[in-house]
């Protein structure tokens, strides 16, 4: 039995290839069935995200194994083999175990240490268990990777600092406001970055969210997900006074929030402070707003300096995490080798018990027929000894004939001979 990990990711393949190799959720069961129909595959898990598609497999070793699996992947997705080969990586046994642990821990992610990948790995594993998981070693490898990822998060600071613009914006808000459960947040825009911001804020139980966007339909989809109110961009001037925090990210070529607008809002708020985080390029908030008393304006450049500092901290934590992964990989491989030995021990014991039962039955039958008890017992002992030492004796003789002293010494050691 061999453990394999093969696939492509953001480091080895462009998005144009990654999207062609991805497995859609509605066809995943079909893909797993097709994969497990391959004669060499004992068990499989398919991990498919926007940044990676990977197969984790338990296989029987055979000639041209790599060729067969690449051919299956290309046939399934109707790909040219040469296009895939240039981007494909292949890990076996120790390297496959280490790779999965690194992936689950966020060490192989586009954003170092990002936590979402662990949930994606867990879902891929759960999907594989719907009648597809047939290899206990593969199952154990995934369970181990989950505990390793948890250990990495607990024992290092890999996830402690914000390294995305969206997360950095939310982190800044949490640093300035003691609790988000008492604040109102105005989000301007409804693109991917604002979506991430909204989800982070929901996780931290913000009191109220308002989403202002050019098109109401797009904003409404996000609002329904996070429990927010939707307003038009033209309503911002009137509603700005309600917001303790404003986070803006649109594609507008001109500022949406001007100095006069913020001045009016501050006056209505009786100069209660406002945090404005402008993560748009070009800027959504006029720079002059930052000169107003009680208006604290941060631009995307301010966030990038926070991110750069935090990324350096994550890289330092990643060194500690890699040490944990190396240790846990070694322990898992020791367990795996022990499992192989356990199967051999079970077979050897079963064989010995079969010989014992066969000869004992013959001896008991002879006793029932009135045979001499002492002679029967001596015959049993002699036959049992000969049957048990027959195979080791043949191996010793063959090693001697071959002049294989190393094998002779291994056999002597295995038989407990001085």
From Swiss-Prot:
Pfam families tied to this protein: GlutR_dimer, GlutR_N, Shikimate_DH
Active site location: 50
Residues the entry annotates as binding NADP(+): 189-194
EC number: 1.2.1.70
Gene Ontology molecular functions: glutamyl-tRNA reductase activity; NADP binding
Site feature location: Important for activity: 99
Record note on domains: Possesses an unusual extended V-shaped dimeric structure with each monomer consisting of three distinct domains arranged along a curved 'spinal' alpha-helix. The N-terminal catalytic domain specifically recognizes the glutamate moiety of the substrate. The second domain is the NADPH-binding domain, and the third C-terminal domain is responsible for dimerization.
PANTHER family membership: GLUTAMYL-TRNA REDUCTASE (PTHR43013:SF1)
Family label: Belongs to the glutamyl-tRNA reductase family.
Name of the featured protein: Glutamyl-tRNA reductase
Organism: Escherichia fergusonii (strain ATCC 35469 / DSM 13698 / CCUG 18766 / IAM 14443 / JCM 21226 / LMG 7866 / NBRC 102419 / NCTC 12128 / CDC 0568-73)
